[in-house]
Each structure stands twice: as C-alpha cells, then as structure tokens.
Amino acid sequence: MRFFSYLGLLLAGLASLASLAGLVSLANLQDFSTDNPLEEELRCWCQYVKNCRFCWACQDGFCKNKVLKNMPSVQEHSYPMEHCMLHRQCKYIRDGPIFQVECTMQTCDAIRLLNV
C-alpha cells in the first residue's frame, strides 16, 4: 500500500512539473507577436499567409506583396489608387472577407501626389 502512495506522490510531482512547463511555454507564446516578424521570417509568412498585413505595402497607389515580387499587385481586387494613398490602407476582397493592409505612404505625401 505504501508503494502506491509513493507512486501517487511521484506522479503528482511530475504532473506539477509538466503543468509548470506548460505555463512557461504559454508565457513565451504570449510574448510572440506576428505583427512585426523578423526579416528572415517574412518570406515564410508572406508565402503561406498572404493576407497578413505586414506582407503588403502601398506602391504607386497599388498594394504589392513585399516579398513575392512576381505576385500580381492587388489592384484588380482593391479600391482605386486614391483610396490606397489617402487612407493608407490596402483593401481587397477575396472570396468573402475584406482584408486591410496598412500602407507605408503618409497621407500628406499622397495628397501632394494627387494634386500634381
């Protein structure tokens, strides 16, 4: 009988350690953010998760993928050039939801370009 109580204590201790390790890994996951991935991870993210907003940039009023240069710009799925420049967002509709992407161009620069 005593053997089983020691075994129970041992298993309870191991379960506590495993749960503590789980908490540590959860804490690490919470610190991980996909808002600003490392430069070396950008290709992987933008190749497989093309709707991530950090994969797209506003270039000449059209939304272009930052990593996949041969990927067509999103002009056929997006609002006009003025919207992209003035609102600093790349928006496009693809099979339902509207994906929004922040543009890198400042609003004052866009207004100056539009008035030229």
From Swiss-Prot:
Coiled coil: none annotated. Induction: Expressed in the early phase of the viral replicative cycle. The keyword Signal applies. Keywords: Early protein, Signal. It comes from the Viruses. Residues 1-19 form the signal peptide. InterPro entries: ASFV_fam_110. Pfam families: v110. Belongs to the asfivirus MGF 110 family. Plays a role in virus cell tropism, and may be required for efficient virus replication in macrophages. This is Protein MGF 110-2L. It comes from African swine fever virus (isolate Tick/Malawi/Lil 20-1/1983).
